[in-house]
Amino acid sequence: MQGIWEAIRDFANPCSVLTKSPLLLRDLPLMLQIAERTSSSACLSIPTLDEKAWRATEPHTPNPRARLEAVAELNRAGIPTGVLIAPLMPGINDAPHQVEPLLEAAIAAGATSIGGIALHLRGEVKGLFMQWLSEQRPDLLARYEQLYRRGAYAPVAERKRLAAMVRRGAPGPLRRISLSRAREDHPGPVIELCDAPDPVQQRLF
């Protein structure tokens, strides 16, 4: 990874990195060198602060609170760093009492952006996830089979519901910040939901 950072620095190539690992802090000196020449930013994905939900769905990943500490440290160092609440999983980590503390913690860590991504189930992952549900959360299996019956993405209505939950969970002042204004004079984190495009029928000719 060091060689990649060095190449980005040497060519002054703007960069942004998305990761779930606080080990990104090891590369902070090189990121700061890049920031002296061009734009450099980061984003850490954090699905939840609910330890039970985290251990059930991401048992071998870094502790979410360690990721938040990395967000805070990167921002203190001058690297704009946001938080991506991902994946958002209906019935697993999307309850208000799960989302709101994470939003508050992200803001406290100085997150420059806060977004969310609904769970995607592509390829073989879909079967594996459904099997996991049947073993660990059989109460949710029928719901997920219905939500993902047409493909890898949840229906638009479900994605909009999750987007609204992220927005509602933000503190009052942030609810009134439009995305355009937030990007212009940066009064606080940008609250948004990163979404997948609706499927479009492709043409052969």
PLM feature spans:
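Conserved AdoMet/S-adenosylmethionine-binding subsite of the radical SAM
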Residues: 1-143, 147, 151, 155
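C-terminal accessory extensions appended to soluble enzyme cores
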Residues: 132-145, 149-205
